UniProtKB/Swiss-Prot annotation:
MF (Gene Ontology): core promoter sequence-specific DNA binding; DNA-binding transcription factor activity; protein homodimerization activity
Species this protein is from: Escherichia coli (strain K12)
Pfam families: Cupin_2, HTH_18
UniProt superkingdom: Bacteria
Record-annotated disulphide pairs: none
DNA-binding region: 193-214, 241-264
Induction remark: By N,N'-diacetylchitobiose.
Protein name per UniProt: HTH-type transcriptional regulator ChbR
Additional remark text: Under prolonged growth on cellobiose as the sole carbon source, spontaneous mutations in chbR and nagC alter the regulation of the chbBCARFG operon, allowing the uptake and metabolism of cellobiose. The mutated regulator makes stronger contact with the target DNA sequence within the chb promoter and has enhanced recognition of cellobiose 6-phosphate as an inducer.
Domain HTH araC/xylS-type, residue spans: 168-274
Gene: chbR
NCBIfam families in the record: PRK10296.1
Biological processes, Gene Ontology terms: negative regulation of DNA-templated transcription
Length: 280
């Protein structure tokens, strides 16, 4: 007896012809709390880079976590959808026309790579991207040059990823500790003591572990989490810089401003002003 054929749900296709208006790139910066597009695929190439926050993408059936500085590259033939379970996330989304990509970038693409692989930008490049986004008038010709360069960086990271030295897997206890430190009650007050307690290790052991696996001290990790939180507050609320400083766990606004500028190259006030100008 023949078994009934069960058809898989059809996957929607986002089409270059509907989005690009004849241009080489389709560029958006999103502040997202939920996915509108759902499960979909494209007839063009795409990458997404996380500027602020964290979220999940499910790519070809595999769910991966993306945090600030992470990106994924979605080639033709892959399908994906996003899940925003950690609140608002700010994303640079770049679509590249099939013709332009295959003319300029395809020869650089690795012969074989996994679409669900998460890649990390280095801090200097991420700071550069944020600086340009905050200062560039995206209606002028500088946009295309900037996006071409960022796309080259993305493809270059894919090209060299397999050549990188394989580092030890991060221990589960350390992953769990860093994950829990994203909770506001953990990073806002007595953050270092909280991190040590969550790890169930001595501070010295924890420091050696974070430096080995993340290349950072516990306080550097804490400050990145705090500043990421503060950026979301500056983007999404009208709270004063002083209020945000205390909410993020800093004992004084001046220390907050100094740390914010060190990690982003902007003061909190100028960061908010640039965002306002960009969104107008």
């Amino acid at each position: 007896m023949m078994q009934p054929v069960i058809n898989a749900p059809e996957i929607a296709t986002a089409r270059e012809q509907q989005l690009f208006n004849g241009k080489n790139f389709h560029v958006f910066i999103y502040n997202k709390t939920e996915s509108i597009s759902g499960l979909h695929q494209h007839d063009y190439y795409e990458f997404t880079l996380v500027l602020t926050g964290r979220y999940f993408q499910e790519i070809n059936g595999k769910r991966v976590l993306l945090e600030r500085g992470d990106f994924v590259f979605i080639p033709l033939g892959s399908h994906h959808q996003s899940f925003y379970e950690f609140g608002a996330t700010r994303i640079l989304n770049v679509g590249i026309s099939k013709r332009f990509f295959e003319q300029h970038y395809l020869p650089l693409l690795p012969y074989c790579f996994v679409a669900s692989q998460v890649y990390r930008t280095n801090n200097a490049f991420l700071t550069y991207v944020e600086t340009v986004i905050s200062s560039l008038n995206f209606r002028e010709t500088g946009l295309e040059e900037f996006v071409e360069m960022v796309t080259f960086y993305v493809i270059n990271r894919l090209r060299h990823y397999r050549e990188e030295q394989v580092i030890d897997d991060v221990p589960q206890w350390l992953k769990s500790t860093v994950e829990k430190m994203h909770d506001k009650e953990q990073f806002s007050e007595s953050a270092l003591e909280n991190m040590v307690a969550l790890s169930a290790k001595s501070q010295e052991y924890l420091t050696r572990a974070t430096q080995r696996y993340y290349g950072k001290t516990p306080m550097q990790i804490i400050n990145e989490i705090r500043i990421n939180f503060a950026k979301k507050q500056l983007e999404m609320t009208n709270y004063s810089v002083t209020d945000i400083a205390f909410e993020a766990g800093y004992s004084s606004p001046s220390l907050f401003i100094k740390t914010f500028k060190k990690l982003t190259s902007f003061t909190p006030k100028s960061y908010r002003k640039k965002l306002t100008e960009f969104n107008q």
